[in-house]
A protein has these predicted regions:
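Conserved N-terminal glycine-rich FAD pyrophosphate-binding loop of Rossmann-like flavoproteins
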Residues: 37-59
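Predominantly flavin-linked oxidoreductase catalytic cores and closely associated redox partners
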Residues: 113-270
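Beta1/beta-strand and adjacent pyrophosphate-binding region of the FAD-binding site
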Residues: 2-15
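Conserved Rossmann-like nucleotide-cofactor binding loop
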Residues: 15, 38, 172
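Glycine-rich FAD pyrophosphate-binding loop
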Residues: 24-44
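FAD/FMN-dependent oxidoreductases across multiple families
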Residues: 68, 246-332, 338, 344
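A conserved beta-strand/loop capping segment in the N-terminal third of enzymes
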Residues: 53, 58-108
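C-terminal helical "tail/cap" subdomain of flavin- and related membrane-associated enzymes
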Residues: 334-427
Length: 427
């Protein structure tokens, strides 16, 4: 039976679109499937660190202000009675600015970028499962059904075939689950909720992070596990949310939407986060972290982005790593395409797992240790109270948490972080 493409990518989020883009750039025929019709909303903080900005630049994505992007110069941190502003570091490896753009338009930009590179995009196509070759046990395609905007069936089932399938289908990953790749319980798991507000400070140049969440008046009530964020979007609105992380797959037992409401009652008044200015409901999502589903590649099926649990335990960012994974996946697939034998092609595809483990495995292990420490609110309070006033400590913390440091060379802070990622066991 003939293949429909060299590679099928399931899911049009950042990881899937990046995979499709790079595969198309390498001259491969690509089929990108997504059940939604773009633009569509996704729960996210919408803020991008310099690491994500670098990945977008590598893809050739334009992020001009007139196209709805806003740049940020660093992180404003509030906690322990302190309020400090930490500029993004000047490094050779990364730009010295971050970005923000609502996911509704951000994902559409990336899908269209992949389409322009030559990927065939089928929207409104819900993948229902993998096609598995009976003799080899390899994934050789997917089954799917057309759906309307409400997810209702809109046509007959269809089958698509390709020698490689990439699962970029999110935290639940129907494809990964269907072949027995379940989530690991020993990896961190986060939870985040967010909404949007109109605000006069929509063009604020700093990503604001609140390291302490109180269940009432700050300093006079109980500390809760988690952190809050305010990311200005430059379009009259800001993304406002809070998150929490657990060192295992068992989420903390907190009503986050209720906590969000209480936090907003004591939010900085200058932001004008009032019920009248809120746009849409508070929505939540799980944040799979630290490679919580493995193997990243086996028997024709690759995992990228949330399907592989690639969110950083340090800061809850997943986009940068999804884009990076898409780049690495496409490189492995392109190399496999030109190999003369099945064994040689398989060796090339397996380099994806090794590459991602080398790039991020040590960092994610450090992140797990970090989460074990800060998941206790009392420890977080002590760290912020005594750590924030110390410039060298915060320089180290910013680079570690944002994963923005020189991977080789650099100053003493860069060398310490790079060294730590190499001496711990890779996730």
């Amino acid at each position: 039976m003939n293949d429909d493409a060299d590679v099928i990518v399931v899911g049009g989020g950042p990881a899937g679109s990046a995979t499709a883009y790079y595969c198309a750039q390498a001259g491969l025929s690509v089929l990108l499937l997504d059940k939604a019709t773009f633009p569509r909303d996704k729960i996210c903080g919408d803020g991008l660190t310099p690491r994500a900005t670098r990945e977008l630049a590598l893809m050739g994505v334009s992020f001009r202000e007139e196209d709805g992007w806003i740049r940020n110069k660093g992180l404003r941190v509030i906690g322990g009675g302190h309020r400090i502003e930490l500029p993004w570091p000047e490094l050779s490896a990364y730009p010295s600015f971050g970005l923000a753009k609502a996911r509704t338009s951000f994902d559409q930009v990336l899908v269209e970028h992949a389409r322009a590179a030559g990927a065939k995009v089928l929207e409104g196509t819900s993948v229902t499962g993998p096609v598995i070759d009976e003799r080899s046990g390899r994934v050789v395609g997917v089954t799917a059904k057309p759906v309307d905007a409400k997810g209702r069936r809109a046509g007959e089932d269809v089958t698509f075939r390709a020698p490689v399938v990439v699962a970029a289908d999110g935290v639940a990953s129907r494809l990964a689950t269907a072949v027995g790749r379940e989530k690991r319980d020993d990896r961190p798991m986060g939870v985040a909720v967010r909404t949007y507000f109109t605000t006069p400070r929509h063009d604020d140049a700093w990503m604001e992070s609140h390291l302490e969440l109180w269940d009432g008046e700050p300093g006079k009530s109980n500390l809760m596990p988690g952190y809050g964020w305010i990311f200005a979007l430059g379009d009259g609105t800001a993304n406002v949310g809070l998150g929490s992380v657990s060192s295992t797959a068992h989420a903390t037992k907190v009503d986050y939407k209720d906590l969000f409401e209480r936090w907003m009652k004591h939010a900085p008044p200058e932001w004008e986060f009032t019920p009248e200015n809120q746009i849409g409901p508070v929505r939540g999502a799980a944040l799979p972290m630290g490679f919580n589903r493995k193997p990243l590649y086996a028997r024709g099926l690759m995992l990228v982005g949330d399907a592989a649990g690639m969110v950083s335990p340090f800061n809850g960012e997943g986009i940068a790593y999804g884009l990076q994974a898409g780049r690495a996946a496409a490189q492995a697939i392109a190399q496999a395409k030109v190999r003369p034998s099945a064994q040689a092609r398989e060796r090339a595809l397996l380099t994806y797992s090794r590459q991602m483990r080398e790039d991020l495995g040590g960092y994610y292990t450090l992140g797990k240790y970090f989460v074990k420490l800060i998941e206790h609110p009392e420890v977080m309070h002590v760290c912020t109270k005594y750590g924030l006033p110390r410039p060298l400590v915060m320089k180290f913390t910013l680079r570690l948490l944002s994963d923005c440091y020189e991977p080789s060379g650099g100053d003493v802070v860069d060398r310490v972080i790079a060294g730590l990622t190499k001496i711990v066991p890779a996730a």
